[in-house]
């Protein structure tokens, strides 16, 4: 039995979240009656309202009146008044991943998982399937610039989804094709141990049906070890690793992007195939690696070399992934979502490759627990930044942890050998600090998953106001 068409209003608690809003938008496009609530207005809420979805600001018990089902994310606590009202009225309550799984059952699905790179890789797979005329349905964890949204309903048989591992619910997703970009210690508040994280990714791959396949990056040692443990599913490996089935070669940085080749080697027949002259308009080896994963899927689904080149060459990127927000006096300001040490190091390396000037990093650490558990890694991931400006920790709902704060982080970076680290007293001081640090040709990279994105968009005009 599939999701019935005659189901009544579907109410989303926390509809403005990036994951929830995408599912709500696709359900609305399918003709279901969708409504929801969120703690505050945001761009996602505004976009959903434009589609005719009723969104209430604030959580109140009466918001769920008349709903046939209530969808909640893991961020919603048990004492939320709408969740409590739904349970009191015996309205079925489902988690975000369960509703996403229901949508996935309507199509053949590619699900993209990994500690980093999910959103960009999901967007690239979508762009490739679009270019191949497959018209996919897409539900992503970020705004795809080509769509202006994180979700779209396509007319084809394929769906492309970002599989969020943060709470373990990605194991509910019925993927026909799985991508695993990397596996690093993250979300230990849920998983408790890194071994549990690895076990979850193994189960994710083993959930793929016998007629499906998984695409896995063996440049990452944990993923390569995982490949060795999976016996009963078809695996396609990718990366710069000489042993990869789909190998990234001749990667050459060029301006704000890169060019490369991809070589395919069939383990059964020994046959090889090469796609050369691929140009990706995004900098960084990590983005070329993400593109290689997407290309591996595209070729398996029958796309031509020319369609692959065209899709990658025209890829418009994802909001908050190395997004240029403006310029001042020859200084370019970049906004990036990177908030884990591995992501930060990759973004700064890409910045270094795409600039002849200095790289100034502005970082807003995200969550006290993350800064505490990965402190050593945070103190060594800024080597490609000539200067680092450190803001206060963005709590994301967490209580402060004594001794884990901006100043402790500044001291840690200096102790680990960084030559130029400054604390940011308050957001209003950022423009003045950047004005003194940056010269024409430099890149200012704002990093974090909190409200630093607002600073990144305001900064060019604030610098202009200073003269």
Curated annotation (Swiss-Prot):
Subcellular compartments: Cytoplasm
Keywords, ordered alphabetically: ATP-binding, Cell cycle, Cell division, Cell shape, Cell wall biogenesis/degradation, Cytoplasm, Ligase, Nucleotide-binding, Peptidoglycan synthesis
Record's signal peptide: none
SUPFAM superfamilies named among the record's database cross-references: MurCD N-terminal domain (SSF51984), MurD-like peptide ligases, catalytic domain (SSF53623), MurD-like peptide ligases, peptide-binding domain (SSF53244)
Catalytic activity entry: UDP-N-acetyl-alpha-D-muramate + L-alanine + ATP = UDP-N-acetyl-alpha-D-muramoyl-L-alanine + ADP + phosphate + H(+)
Gene Ontology biological process terms, A to Z: cell division; cell wall organization; peptidoglycan biosynthetic process; regulation of cell shape
Any Gene Ontology CC annotation: cytoplasm
Protein origin, superkingdom: Bacteria
GO molecular function: ATP binding; UDP-N-acetylmuramate-L-alanine ligase activity
Function per UniProt: Cell wall formation.
Family named by the database record: Belongs to the MurCDEF family.
Name listed for the protein in its UniProt record: UDP-N-acetylmuramate--L-alanine ligase
Lineage per the UniProt record: Bacteria, Pseudomonadati, Pseudomonadota, Alphaproteobacteria, Hyphomicrobiales
